Amino acid sequence: MADAEDIQPLVCDNGTGMVKAGFAGDDARAVFPSIVGRPRHTGVMVGMGQKDAYVGDEAQSKRGILTLKYPIEHGIVSNWDDMEKIWHHTFYNELRVAPEEHPVLLTEAPLNPKANREKMTQIMFETFNVPAMYVAIQAVLSLYASGRTTGIVLDSGDGVSHTVPIYEGYALPHAILRLDLAGRDLTESLMKILTERGYMFTTSAEREIVRDIKEKLAYVALDYEQELETAKSSSSIEKNYELPDGQVITIGAERFRCPEVLFQPSMIGMEAAGIHETTYNSIMKCDVDIRKDLYGNIVLSGGTTMFPGIADRMSKEITALAPSSMKIKVVAPPERKYSVWIGGSILASLSTFQQMWISKAEYDERGPSIVHRKCF
């Protein structure tokens, strides 16, 4: 192995919906959906080079003939064989690197089962033979990326949302709250709403179309009830969307009904507090002396916080819950879709971080449980 100096660490943010990967200090050069697709039909033409599994963008482009599966559900890996395929694809096809030559930084949702990170550690060392690795908490990385050391991060991706209060660089584990409601649930809910209107979206491939509608057209209303009234009386919020077969559908109130679920989970029958209330509850679990700093640094992160209007609504809802004199600031960095990856890239490049890696030698000596001792 060459000098540790010239070896760039790899940063891989395995989201439920998207994998973001690249070299520390660079930009995330590989961003692709966390999908493994398998053909629904048997191949009849010889020499077509059909594969038994497709990963990422290739699976996405051939989705019409595939069954698409996401190996990560709610931030937890549910299918390790597929997950291995995704990592293999990341290293060898996307980044074109030999993983045995680079330390690898992986990310994980807080409050994940311990077995999940142990298995991640085991696969990295035993299947990919990495020289060193580390598992970091996603929300903490987002805070790094925003240049703060104190704040509360609301990280909402495709599979899981969580609020993580961090003070002077320390996450406060007792106050971390997790909400298994995120982008994928919003896509499901939009599929239902559109089905009610007579558009049939049922297959795993069609779900991807609905996800695209959601990402392009949905927004968060500042006042939901008022917006519903507006939607009834005028067509100002209606937008058209062209389906892949050329059919055009018009969507109106669905545009803000879909993300409203984040603030009112009861809309999809979930007995949980909305993201604003979860953030508030998380702050209230912290020491009274640090709450002011948390209220003033509410940082949004993850793809599901990309809806237009979400920061203003969040600010309005938390102002209503907090003490009246409290100064509330919701920060929505423009690059928040990738802020976990960016934070990982910053962290892995720090000279002070270099002694934090779990080395192959330590792994061989202690086994997968070493990950709990070395990674927060």
From Swiss-Prot:
SUPFAM superfamilies reported in the protein's UniProt record: Actin-like ATPase domain
One MF term in the entry's GO annotations: hydrolase activity
Coiled-coil region: none
Matching InterPro entries: Actin, Actin/actin-like_CS, Actin_CS, ATPase_NBD
Top-level class of the enzyme under EC nomenclature: hydrolase
Documented EC number(s): 3.6.4.-
Gene Ontology, cellular component aspect: cytoplasm; cytoskeleton
SMART domains cross-referenced by the UniProt entry: ACTIN (SM00268)
Location, primary (coarse class): cytoplasm
Location within or outside the cell: Cytoplasm, Cytoskeleton
Catalyses which reaction(s): ATP + H2O = ADP + phosphate + H(+)
Keywords tagged on the record: ATP-binding, Cytoplasm, Cytoskeleton, Hydrolase, Nucleotide-binding
PANTHER family assigned to the protein according to its UniProt record, in alphabetical order: ACTIN
General function of this protein: Actins are highly conserved proteins that are involved in various types of cell motility and are ubiquitously expressed in all eukaryotic cells.
Family in the record: Belongs to the actin family.
Protein's name according to its UniProt entry: Actin-1
Organism of origin: Pisum sativum (Garden pea)
